[in-house]
């Protein structure tokens, strides 16, 4: 069937999207495994030792992708929460709910690896730096989104309330990104920039970008897996879910 003739709106229904998500998950999971495997190899065995930080810098191959994904996932979560709020789309709200735990995990991973990197670099596990503090606020926003959603029994009212919180929290994302430019911070500037040539070795940059692709694939696979679970939970009283779980 030509792509132009496919009725894409049919996949806005949880019942229609559920099997599609199931078919996509293995492909994203395999891609995540391959990209992360190659990224780890490049980061640990191919990339040279940094002249200033020695071997300690290698945590960048986890820290930077996790930090990037913490912001990307939040923007995606807020976007789908907003779509669900404006258009009353159940699947969009479910997707926002499914993205939240993955985003929280990415944020925690960024903070944890940042602490491990900061100890040999700054001499402290934590400093109240503008970027670190705003990243911590991002973690609290994820936790607040999940907690608020879980605290309200009515799913539709929970979707609306959590969506408002997610949309308000979007203002924190540019603060995280531009904090090193707006304030005098300990945190280094952007590792990759579109306006200037990279300051790191090519193998370092390649390893970090490959790991980032792996993290992208992982986040998509994890969100789709959790979305399927959310669909089954929210639609458990429907006939089609009863047929699925009885197989």
PLM segments and residue spans:
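Polytopic transmembrane helical bundles with strong interfacial aromatic enrichment
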Residues: 2-247
């Amino acid at each position: 069937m030509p792509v132009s003739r496919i009725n894409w709106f049919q996949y806005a229904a949880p019942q229609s999207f559920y099997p599609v998500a199931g078919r996509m998950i293995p492909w994203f999971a395999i891609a995540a495994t391959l990209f992360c495997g190659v990224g780890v190899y490049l980061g640990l065995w191919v990339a040279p030792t940094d002249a200033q930080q020695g071997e300690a810098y290698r945590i960048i191959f986890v820290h930077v992708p996790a930090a990037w994904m913490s912001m990307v996932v939040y923007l995606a979560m807020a976007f789908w929460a907003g779509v669900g709020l404006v258009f009353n789309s159940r699947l969009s709200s479910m997707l926002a709910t499914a993205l939240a735990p993955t985003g929280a995990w990415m944020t925690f991973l960024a903070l944890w690896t940042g602490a491990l990197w900061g100890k040999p670099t700054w001499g402290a596990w934590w400093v109240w730096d503008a970027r670190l503090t705003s990243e911590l606020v991002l973690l609290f926003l994820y936790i607040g989104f999940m907690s608020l959603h879980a605290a309200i029994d009515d799913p539709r009212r929970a979707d609306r309330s959590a969506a408002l919180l997610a949309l308000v929290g979007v203002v924190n994302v540019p603060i995280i990104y531009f904090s090193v430019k707006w304030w005098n911070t300990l945190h280094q500037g952007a590792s990759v920039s579109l306006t200037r040539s990279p300051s790191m070795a090519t193998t370092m940059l390649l390893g970090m970008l490959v790991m980032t692709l792996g993290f992208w694939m992982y986040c998509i696979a994890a969100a789709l897996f959790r979305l399927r679970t959310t669909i089954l939970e929210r639609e458990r009283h429907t006939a089609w879910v009863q047929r699925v779980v009885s197989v």
